[in-house]
Amino acid sequence: MILIIYAHPYPHHSHANKRMLEQAGTLENVEIRSLYHLYPDFNIDVAAEQEALSRASLIVWQHPMQWYSVPPLLKLWMDKVLTHGWAYGHGGTALHGKHLLWAVTTGGGENHFAIGSHPGFDVLSQPLQATALYCGLKWLSPFAMHCTFICDDDTLQAQARQYKQRLLAWQEVNHG
């Protein structure tokens, strides 16, 4: 099963993430957990989140990039849900062997993240990749949708279909 942990502070303003979720939602065995919908008060139900994670073979962290990082509720979710003794540390093997995909949207163009005056995309992903590896997850190459503020609807739809194809390809290879 694919579990999408979706964190968008302003989902009603989203164009790209909305289309990505619509495409992903057409696949079988996909569960979408919208953190800002579930936890508007930031009071995360850790047991429910850990239960959802335990059912998944592929975990997707999907969100818009905010200040070169994750939205605040996703960071809190990581702090609360990925606990010692469950996700890492002595006895913390609940996530071992599962796959993790970072699916991120950005307002800037892909060249904005080239090494130079701004951090490279590989550099920006390091904290998430380190978290994944520390929890025994298998890090997959990220899916990024760039220039989302200026993309026309056809381009957004095409990129959202690419996202769906990425998830479908994972399902076909992993029978999940």
From Swiss-Prot:
Gene3D superfamilies, alphabetized: 3.40.50.360
InterPro entries linked to this entry: Flavodoxin_fold, Flavoprotein-like_sf, K_H_efflux_KefF, KefG/KefF
Binding site for FMN: 8, 14-17, 65-68, 105-108
UniProt keyword terms in alphabetical order: Cell inner membrane, Cell membrane, Flavoprotein, FMN, Membrane, NAD, Oxidoreductase
Enzymatic reactions: a quinone + NADH + H(+) = a quinol + NAD(+); a quinone + NADPH + H(+) = a quinol + NADP(+)
Cell compartments where the protein resides: Cell inner membrane
GO biological process, one term: potassium ion transport
Catalytic EC class: oxidoreductase
Flavoprotein in keyword set: yes
A GO molecular function held by the record: NADPH dehydrogenase (quinone) activity
Functional description taken from the UniProt entry: Regulatory subunit of a potassium efflux system that confers protection against electrophiles. Required for full activity of KefC. Shows redox enzymatic activity, but this enzymatic activity is not required for activation of KefC.
PANTHER family per UniProt: GLUTATHIONE-REGULATED POTASSIUM-EFFLUX SYSTEM ANCILLARY PROTEIN KEFF, GLUTATHIONE-REGULATED POTASSIUM-EFFLUX SYSTEM ANCILLARY PROTEIN KEFG
Family, per entry: Belongs to the NAD(P)H dehydrogenase (quinone) family. KefF subfamily.
Protein name, per record: Glutathione-regulated potassium-efflux system ancillary protein KefF
Organism of origin: Salmonella typhimurium (strain LT2 / SGSC1412 / ATCC 700720)
Encoding gene per record: kefF
